[in-house]
Every structure is written in C-alpha cells, then in structure tokens.
Amino acid sequence: MAKEVTVYNNDVDYQSSLAYEFRNVVSKDKDLRMSSEAKIDIGYPTGFLGFDFMNGYKVHNNGETKYNLGISDGSMVMVIGRSGCGKSTFCTQMAANIVRPFKTSTIFEDSIEGGMVKERRMQLSGFNTEAEYKKRFVIRNTGITAETFLARIKYIHDLKLADPERFKYDTGYVDDEGNPIRLFEPTVYILDSIALIMPDDLVEEGEVSTNMSVTRTAKVVTDIIRRVVPMLKMAKTISFLMYPFVLRKLTWCIWNKVNLYLVVKL
C-alpha cells in the first residue's frame, strides 16, 4: 500500500513561516551576533589578477555585475613560502589594494621582520606620505602572543560593531525588498608569521623547544583561530597569515587550495 504524502505549496504566506517568526524576534535583539543576517559576500580585488580570478565566483544571473573577483570579506588566508620569497611584499601590496578605495579601511600588522621598515611599506603600498601611512597602517613589533593577537582582533571587531554606521558603505547591491545593502568597509590584518602566536606564559618562560611546548602551542593556536574566524566574518576583516616553509627553488607562482597559497621564486 502506497504511503500518503502531503505536498505543501511553496508559495505560502511569508508571515506564516518560521523564517518570519525568527527574524521578527531577533530584530528586537541588540546583540548583532543574533540579529545580523548574511545577505551577500563581497570580493575585494587585490591587484593580482590571477589571484583574484582564482578567488572569483558567479554572483548574479542577471544585472550588470555577474562575477565577484578578489578575496571575500571575512576570509582568513594562509600564505606559505620560504624565507625571502616575497610573502611580506605580496601581502603588503594586496592589503593596500584592498583598503585603498575605502574611507575608514586600515591595515593592522604584527611583524618582527627587520627588512619591512616604514619606508619600504610606503613604497610598496603607494601610501607614500606620512599622513596616508599613519591613516592606513597600524604596526606592532613587540608583545606579539596568541592572547594579544586574539585581543586585537576582538578590539577591531568591537570598535566596528559599536558604531556600525561610521564604518559602513553602500555596496551598490539591494536585497530582495529593494533596500540598499550596506556592509562594513574591509579591514586587513597581517600576521608576519604564524609562529608568533605562542601562549603568553611560554614566551615569558622561553619554553619553546620542549615537546610539551609544541603540543600546547598547537592547541592554543587552534583555539585562537577557531575563535577569530567568526569575528573576522562579522567585522568584514581579511586576515593574512604567513608561514615560512622550505621548498625547492621554483618559478614564482600562487597556488590556491582552500584559502592556502604558496609563494615561491627562483
């Protein structure tokens, strides 16, 4: 005997749906983690066309904008390459091209690299006056630990969410009801080396060579990344993490595999 199946009409009244009830409740909630709903992802061009193409995706079947090229807002990107291959140069230029069109966008960087001095950043980024540099870059080269990395990401997140209209811009898109979609202007955070984010106590004690320290550091870094990702997405922050890796000498290339990029040179 065939089982009777009830077929529901997809064109039901919106106000009778669970989606309507949920949005009606959370719209009264001041906690943006509950009331903010994703409507669109924006890709930000980096100035490297091959890189932007690999990160692109189709966004509309109709209208003027059919493709979104560049790095999506809220992304975390790992850039891998051996020492001296150009990771810092690559990330600095990408970051500058992402933030340049926006009024409030800033590049935060944790770096201990001696060669990447202010003058070199100014040259690479094109922000070559003191006023432009001060507006666009916030650099830290001491006190970098797992805890302070998380604290700075959270601080950026909290500042933007506390005054959203100050940091938002009109994307040029509209939602299903015809209302303009306004999103946070992108922020870029560069971490010079993933190895910098070690626990506070291990940095103070100098326990960097024991097996226990390595295991503990890995656990802390995993936890930090897990906690950082939602804040990056909410505050439209793009994070570049660099990792030194010894490789055979190859021609310069960028290899894409799930937000993992390889940068090497002759």
Regions found by a protein language model. Give the residues of each.
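Conserved ATPase-coupling elements of RecA-like P-loop NTPase cores
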Residues: M198-E207, L232-K233, K265
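Phosphate-binding/switch region of NTP-binding enzymes
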Residues: T6, V214-L266
